[in-house]
Amino acid sequence: AAIKGVEMSLAVPPVAGPYRRGIPLRMTQAHCHSLSVDSEGGHSHEEPGPRRLLDLADRLPASASVTLFELDPNSNKRSQLISRLINSPEFSASQARYWRDVIFSRATEMRSRQMSPPVFQAWMTEQFEQKQSWDKIVENLLTATGDVRENGATALLFAHGGEAAELAAETSRIFLGIQIQCANCHYHPTDRWKRIQFHQLAAFFPRVRVRQKRDATPRSFEVVSQDASRRGRRSPSPQALGLMFRRLDRNRDGKLVKSEVADSRLARSFDRFLQRGDANQDGGLSLKEFQKLPPPGNNNRRFETEHYMPNLNEPGNRGEAIRPVFFATGGRANEGLDDLERRQLLANHVTSTRNQWFARAYVNRTWSVLLGEGFAMPIDDMGPEREVAHPEVFDLLCRDFTESGYDIRRLFEIIAGTRAYQRQIRPRDPTDPTPPFASAQPSRLRADQIYNALLEVLGVESTSLGRRSFRRRRPGQSNDMMSRRRSAGRTLFLALFGFDPSTPQEDIKGNVPQALYLMNSPLIHAMVRAGGNTRLARILRKHPGNDDAIAEVYLLVLSREPSASELKICRDYITEVGNRGEAFEDLMWSLVNSSEFLSRR
């Protein structure tokens, strides 16, 4: 099929089981020829295969494996490598780390970022190792209950404190690629979604609660369902309100202001009380205004079991009770369903084959992970009014993903098998009007990938990176203590280099703290020394000739050999410095600090 002048060779393998047979697809070669890219995937234009370990396993290859791969005459070596990686435990761990970043990068419950990521990551790794389908994973995330330190599937619910509006927004953004939260207070500015549709989605979640577990050590929370209303227990009498008012009115002027309630339970909500009850707009609440405050609606969820759409013209009004309806398909919830039944129904609607957005969101995101940009950008803001690049290809992949039973590995293998993916990554001129996907685009490595790459290049254990000092294991130190040190080092590094994977690549920028870390880290300086038993020292002892040593350093850090011009620059610099060890220290340090090391290039 000829699709807008782009050639990709997208071979879709047959689907196992009762699904249809695979669809072979070849696109025209005109666009690739216009960019002087060999449409048959010539060696000089192909990305070194082992570098793909970063994409699929979050780590760099050993320099020796790069050389062996390039020398291997097997014409199927790339497809074999990809298949081996996708079916490895490292792929499962890599995907778990990716989805950890997706969920927690926008968490509104800050405590979840300290408690949940390791548990979620372990649970998600297990899902991928068991080759769980994407619909089952999402179903578990939407219907989970239990201790957040024990059940990793509670991550999404805990990350947003069980708040219905936040969960509706993130469910749509992550799993459907639609940012329907823009319709929270008004019609969506660019898509057809209406305000009522956002609140109908939120109405699947009002009975979710996140509460602290009593006497739990260490401190923990649990996701539970609250199906019985407690409204009758929460409205104090006018007399009780009068006593509270007089106790808080410290200057006895008959008016409560913010400074007077600063140390009380009302402090967090006082601005909202003013907005709702300050009839004369004098910046305070009289006793009469205080007693007339409307009962809290959605803002005091402890007592609500239904979702209300606020009346924007009457802020003091709780609003209209909304019944659950899934906006993408129109699926409705019957009355009388409890929390778990509602969330299960929502999961069924979200993952249904009738809901095209479920497959579209995952396919678009996966294509972006591997090729640096999606068919629609941003990847979490597609929407029905957006155009996608090469819709025929996109629809083919979405249809195949759906009919395969949402087989994650199959989708990765199909995309990784395209010539667009296997070609050398080439930046595209943003002013170039030609279609995308002649090859993958440069993209910033995730924090885990940089961390693992540094471990490989420096030849150190993960007990050190991210920590202020480099300490080896002390005599008598337990494995558990070492494990905690490794975890702490990675956690600190992720806090410095982490970013939301849903962010478009052009919006991901390095910052000063990251640059200072790479330039000034005592560990990096210590491990790029030419003396002792560092990686660099061993390379220099192994290769007395400078050209071989330069090539080995490039293979170690960038997984490729230097170009002729790079080799000349290195030779000239070594001659200029006059000290072999010092010159190679500068070379290795500069490569570790290069944009190529931090990116897929």
Regions found by a protein language model. Give the residues of each.
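N-terminal pre-domain segments of enzymes
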Residues: 2-29
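Primarily short, surface-exposed interaction patches in extracytoplasmic proteins
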Residues: 19-22, 30, 34-50, 55, ...
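Key residue(s) within conserved catalytic/signature motifs
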Residues: 99
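Residue-level detector of alpha-helical secondary structure
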Residues: 186, 271-274, 291
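Primarily EF-hand calcium-binding motifs
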Residues: 240-251, 270-281
